[in-house]
Amino acid sequence: KIILFANQKGGVGKTTICGLFSNYLSDTRNVSLLVIDADPQQTFASRRKDDSRRQKDIPYNVQSVTIKDPSSTRNIMLTLRGLAGTTIIDTPGSLTQEGMKELLANADYIVCPYHYDLNTIDSTRAFILAVLRLKQAYPQIKAQFIFVCNKYDVRVGKGSELQAWKIVDEFFKKYGILA
């Protein structure tokens, strides 16, 4: 399986959740894992290098990949598609980034972190609709959305906010799985 962590909104915890999920699969589920940082910021890969300096036995490495060239990105994805195990990819924060279409075309899942503020909701909704337009233009894109609410505390929120959040969740459920 190829799992992308993607959202065009920055600060939603995409890289952090990608790392947590990778740790879970590696440590708890003992899954054969390849982790790739395709985000130009290379935050995940940089953190993992720091980890490897402090620890001897890290359970997995994070490979840095540049996706600026769609042709080479397509070749990388075809290679990944043929591998056993699970590939986790931390993606750039923009669908307009060269190579994103190739990532999406070969993914099984798009894990899309979000949180309940208007800017994030609007940006995440725009991201969903942009991916849906890409799916229409490129039918080979079959990836299923998994939405992960981040920075959510069940003890917080007025009645009106809770109702608004429920509407947001219902909207996201139309397009994928709400985790």
Predicted regions and their residues:
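Walker A/P-loop phosphate-binding motif and the immediately C-terminal alpha-helix
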Residues: 1-37
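Short, well-ordered alpha-helices that flank and scaffold nucleotide-derived cofactor binding pockets
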Residues: 19, 23-27, 49-50, 105, ...
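Residues in the short beta-alpha loop(s) of Rossmann-like NAD(P)-binding domains
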Residues: 39-41, 151
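P-loop NTPase switch/communication element
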Residues: 41-58
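Switch II (G3) loop of P-loop NTPases
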Residues: 39, 80-100
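Generic beta-sheet signal
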Residues: 1-3, 33, 84-89, 145
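Conserved catalytic-core segment of NTP-binding enzymes
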Residues: 34, 92-178
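Conserved nucleotide-sensing/catalytic segment adjacent to the nucleotide-binding pocket
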Residues: 55-89
